Regions:
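Conserved glycine-centered short motifs in functionally critical loops
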Residues: 81-83, 87, 91-93, 148-171, ...
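Charged, low-complexity terminal tails
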Residues: 1-157, 533, 538
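P-loop NTP-binding catalytic core
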Residues: 45, 56, 95-115, 121, ...
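Conserved catalytic network of the ASCE P-loop NTPase/AAA+ motor domain
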Residues: 25-26, 61-64, 75-78, 133-136, ...
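Active-site phosphate-binding and catalytic loops of NTP-dependent enzymes
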Residues: 20, 29-32, 53-64, 126-133, ...
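Charged, low-complexity intrinsically disordered tails
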Residues: 1-9, 177-312, 319, 433-538
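Phosphate-interacting basic helix/loop segments used at nucleotide- and nucleic-acid interfaces
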Residues: 56, 60-80, 122-149, 189-195, ...
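Loop/turn-to-beta-strand initiation segments
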Residues: 137-140, 243-244, 295, 339, ...
Length: 538
């Protein structure tokens, strides 16, 4: 060891070389598990065998977020500062005026000077007032889907086109250069700035270096840029040749997106249960990095791949309303049209003498789990978390810091506010597609999506009310009435409400005959003439 040298110290250049060559890489415990079936493909991201992200794609329901279309403006709504564009779907896409204006780079991106020394005259500034004149009704417009159809709403689109690659994002109509702020090492950022300025990006276009570009060689960026420029050339060709509406660039399928978005240097292994898909993935990765190609493995086990890696049970738990925490507390997640509500409870965690410590521990674990569940369930929009009340402002700050730190792993943009005086934390999460639950479930035909049905007591009251009306109306003609109900309601009628039914028979000099039908909805009953079978109405 040289005098004054720190133990285990590695010169910066040596560290960079080792990172590029993959020497001494430590296991991160992160792996991708991919299941390929005829109707559905599924990707699970595991960190130390814990499910962190889960994506599904079905053959009949392909993802369109990121796809580029040549659309036609159908109508303009100045009142809501938006227009509706036909891009070939049942519902027209929604284009807000500010999404039709050239945008600045996101706050998560550091803007880099191109360094070409050519002072270019700035283009006239466009405002939302100019949009109707630029894109009148009937005109063609090049757009990209930024948010897929959710519920009864059509896709949301933008004219701010971007093509994401493995290491770069190409912006054909934005000449800015940028580097992801998630790359924090100052020396690495300086190295990437130099590479960025040396890239041969066509005039008028810009590029952003993605987080995954940290530690990568210059040639990887050159190769990635070449692929993106070729993609853009195909878009331009389609723009000239195809009539609107037309799809000019289709967002890659789940396998290709997994290579682009998930397969980073932090991923130890990719395990996939389909030989053809594994080979295709290796070929895709091989275009960029031969070293990363070795991490892709074909699973040949007899047991289903998601069961083998413990994914299935974790997916099932992802649909539960209540999620338990290690300390014994739990959170409750309710997904509504307007917002996502999360409630935090101490649950079984009540035995500690120091209640403040118990509450802090529960809230800290809840902060971790809330961030994980948002990503896992792919829920976004407005989220309000009701934490257990903390008197100490320092404890509130600790919970706020914890959830902010945990959300750094999330690719979706998030914005979090500190805990309010009411103990509520408000946050937003970017919502590009429908949630996992919305993709998997449909509204319950029994409760119409409410999640509740009327109790047997309520149904008994409503039935007795109906019997009074029916028997009063038909008492001169019908003397025997058949009542068909669900077994749960019949059980209530024969026990708690038997005297009330006898009173009805006495009052109208008639006879009631009850029949249970297990196929009936719990809220359904039928009153009919026992002799003719004709249904009786009040």
């Amino acid at each position: 060891m040289l005098p004054g040298e720190r133990p285990n110290y590695q010169p910066p250049m040596l560290e960079t070389v080792k990172r590029l060559l993959g020497i001494g890489k430590k296991s991160t415990g992160i792996k991708l598990v991919i299941s390929c079936e005829k109707l559905e493909k599924r990707v699970a991201l595991l960190e130390n065998n814990r499910l962190e992200e889960y994506t599904i794609e079905r053959e009949t329901d392909r993802n369109i977020v990121g796809s580029i279309f040549k659309g036609k403006v159908r109508n303009i709504e100045p009142g809501i500062k938006a227009m509706f564009v036909d891009i070939g779907f049942e519902k027209n896409a929604f284009l807000q005026f500010w999404d039709a204006i050239p945008a600045a780079l996101d706050s998560g991106i550091e803007t880099i000077n191109r360094g070409n020394g050519n002072a270019k005259k700035k283009a006239p500034r466009i405002t939302h007032k100019d949009v109707p004149n630029i894109y009148p009704v009937g005109s063609d417009v090049l757009v990209q889907v930024k948010k897929g159809p959710i519920s009864n709403k059509g896709p949301r689109i933008t004219t701010d086109i971007s093509l994401p690659g493995r290491y770069l994002v190409l912006m054909p109509f934005n000449d800015q250069f940028g580097i992801s702020r998630k790359i924090e090492d100052p020396k690495e950022r300086e190295r990437l700035r130099k590479i960025l300025r040396e890239l041969e990006v066509p005039e008028g276009m810009g590029v952003i270096m993605r987080t995954v570009g940290a530690g990568q060689r210059s040639r990887y960026f050159v190769r990635d840029l070449s692929i993106l420029l070729e993609q853009w050339a195909q878009v331009q060709k389609g723009l000239e040749e195809k009539p609107a509406p037309a799809c000019l660039f289709e967002e890659p399928d789940l396998i290709e997106r997994s290579v682009r978005d998930f397969l980073t240097d932090e991923v130890d292994a990719v395990i996939i249960d389909d030989a053809k898909a594994a080979e295709r993935m290796q070929n895709l990765v091989g275009q960029i990095s031969k070293r990363a190609k070795k991490s892709i493995q074909h699973y040949t086990g007899v047991q289903p791949i998601f069961e083998c890696f413990g994914v299935k049970a974790q997916i099932d738990a992802a649909f539960h309303r209540q999620v338990w925490l290690p300390c014994g507390g739990y959170i409750v997640i309710d997904e509504t049209e307007a917002m996502i509500a999360v409630d935090v409870n101490t649950g079984r965690n009540k035995g500690a003498k120091d209640m403040e410590k118990t509450i802090l521990q529960t809230n800290l674990e809840a902060a971790e789990e809330i961030a994980r569940q948002l990503r896992l369930r792919n829920i976004g929009g407005l989220i309000v978390a009701d934490f257990i009340d903390m008197k100490n402002r320092k404890d509130q700050q600790a919970v706020y810091t914890r959830i902010k730190e945990r959300l750094k792993r999330d690719k979706a943009r998030t914005h979090v506010l500190p805990i309010s005086q009411l103990g509520l934390m408000e946050m937003t999460r970017q919502r590009a597609n429908e949630s996992l639950a919305s993709a998997v479930f449909i509204p319950c035909p029994h409760c119409s999506g409410k999640g509740v049905i009327k109790s047997p007591m309520t149904m008994s009251v409503e039935l007795q009310r109906a019997l009074h009306s029916v028997m009063r109306k038909h008492q001169e003609i019908v003397h025997e009435v058949r009542v068909t109900v669900h077994p749960d309601l019949l059980n209530r009628l024969r026990t708690d409400d038997e005297e009330h039914l006898i009173d009805i028979e006495r009052r109208y000099a008639g006879r009631l005959v009850f029949r249970a039908d297990p196929t009936f909805h719990q809220e359904k009953f039928v009153i009919s003439d026992a002799k003719t079978g004709e249904e009786l109405k009040a």
